[in-house]
Design a protein with these regions (language model features):
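Short alpha-helix in the alpha/beta-hydrolase fold that links the catalytic acid
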Residues: 32, 181, 195-204
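Gly/Ala-rich beta-loop-alpha elbow adjacent to hydrolase catalytic centers
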Residues: 76-85
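Acidic catalytic loop of the alpha/beta-hydrolase fold
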Residues: 189-194, 221
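Flexible "cap/lid" loop of the alpha/beta hydrolase fold
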Residues: 90-124
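Conserved alpha/beta-hydrolase catalytic His-Asp/Glu region
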Residues: 126-177
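Conserved HGGG/HGGXW glycine-rich cap/lid loop of the alpha/beta-hydrolase fold
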Residues: 2-52
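Short beta-strand/loop motif that positions the catalytic acidic residue
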Residues: 179, 185-187, 191
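Catalytic histidine-centered segment of alpha/beta-hydrolase-like enzymes
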Residues: 55, 218-231
Length: 259
C-alpha cells in the first residue's frame, strides 16, 4: 500500500514536468509520453497514495504532491489530475499546465459533473477490466496494461471510491484565467468520460488565448494511446514556457507549504 505520494524523475533536459494521472489510473501510464519528452524536459511520474487515509480531494492531494515533489515548471494532467494541477498552478507551484482530457471543476463536465461521486461506486461494483479500459482508451488494451488505465485491485477501487466522494467535499481550485500561467488543452474526439464539449467550459477558466487541440480517434487517455501526437503538441509549448514571473504585492498568491 502506498501511504504517501511516490514519484520518479526520469533523466532529461529542460523544464521539470510533473505527470498527473486521473482518479483511478496509475502514473505508470505516462511512461511512453515521458520517454518522448526526455529530450526537452525532465519528466516526473507520480503515483497517488492508496487506502482509506487517501480519501483526499484535489486540494489536499495537491498539498501532498507538493510536499513530495516540490515546485515544478509544468504539469501534464489527465482527467481529475487537472483539478490537482489547477491547485498547484494557482498556488504558484507550477508555471504551466497541459490539460489532457481534463477539467479543473466538476461543472466543466456539464450535468454529469454532478455525478462525479458515482465514479467511486462504479469502480467498486463495476470492477473495471479490459472492457472498461478499452472504452476509456477507445481501442483494445493488452491485458498486462489494463492496470495503467483503470483501477483493477480492491485497494485501488476502494481508494477511488473514497477519493471520488471527497471531491465535492472541498472548494474547487481558483480560476487560472487572470494568473500568469501558460496552459494548453488536448482532447480526444472519442472521449466518452470527459466529452469534447468540456473543453469550451474549461478554456473559459484559463488564460485568454489558451490553445486547444482535438486528437482524432483518441479516447480519454491520449497520453497513453497517442504519446507521439501528444509529445509533438507539447514540445513547442514546453519550449515556449515563460520564465518565472516575480509578482508584486498587489497580486498575492498563496503558496503551498512544503514540510
Amino acid at each position: 500500500m502506498r501511504r504517501v505520494v511516490e514519484w520518479t524523475q526520469l533523466p532529461g533536459e529542460g523544464p521539470r514536468v510533473l505527470m498527473l494521472p486521473g482518479l483511478g489510473a496509475r502514473g505508470a501510464g505516462f511512461q511512453a509520453l515521458a520517454r518522448r519528452l526526455q529530450h526537452v524536459a525532465r519528466p516526473l511520474l507520480v503515483e497517488y497514495p492508496e487506502g482509506p487515509h487517501a480519501a483526499r480531494g484535489a486540494g489536499a492531494l495537491a498539498q501532498e504532491v507538493f510536499e513530495a515533489c516540490g515546485p515544478v515548471d509544468a504539469v501534464v494532467a489527465s482527467s481529475f489530475g487537472g483539478m490537482v494541477a489547477a491547485h498547484l498552478a494557482a498556488a504558484g507551484a507550477a508555471r504551466g499546465v497541459a490539460f489532457l482530457g481534463s477539467f479543473t471543476r466538476t461543472e466543466h463536465l456539464g450535468p454529469r459533473g454532478r455525478l462525479i461521486a458515482m465514479m467511486g461506486p462504479i469502480a467498486v461494483l463495476g470492477r473495471p477490466g479490459p472492457l472498461t479500459a478499452a472504452l476509456a482508451s477507445w481501442r483494445p488494451i493488452a491485458p498486462s496494461r489494463v492496470p495503467e488505465v483503470v483501477p483493477t485491485t480492491r485497494l485501488e477501487r476502494m481508494t477511488t471510491l473514497h477519493r471520488a466522494f471527497a471531491i465535492r467535499g472541498e472548494p474547487p481550485p481558483p480560476s487560472l484565467r487572470g494568473l500568469p500561467v501558460s496552459c494548453v488543452c488536448i482532447q480526444g474526439n472519442r472521449d466518452v468520460l470527459v466529452p469534447p464539449a468540456t473543453v469550451k467550459r474549461l478554456v473559459a477558466s484559463l488564460p485568454p488565448g489558451t490553445p486547444q487541440y482535438l486528437l482524432r480517434g483518441a479516447g480519454h487517455v491520449p497520453y497513453f494511446t497517442h504519446p507521439e501526437e501528444c509529445a509533438r503538441l507539447l514540445e513547442p509549448w514546453l519550449a515556449a514556457l515563460a520564465p518565472p514571473v516575480t509578482l508584486g504585492s498587489s497580486s498575492p498568491r498563496p503558496m503551498l507549504q512544503r514540510v
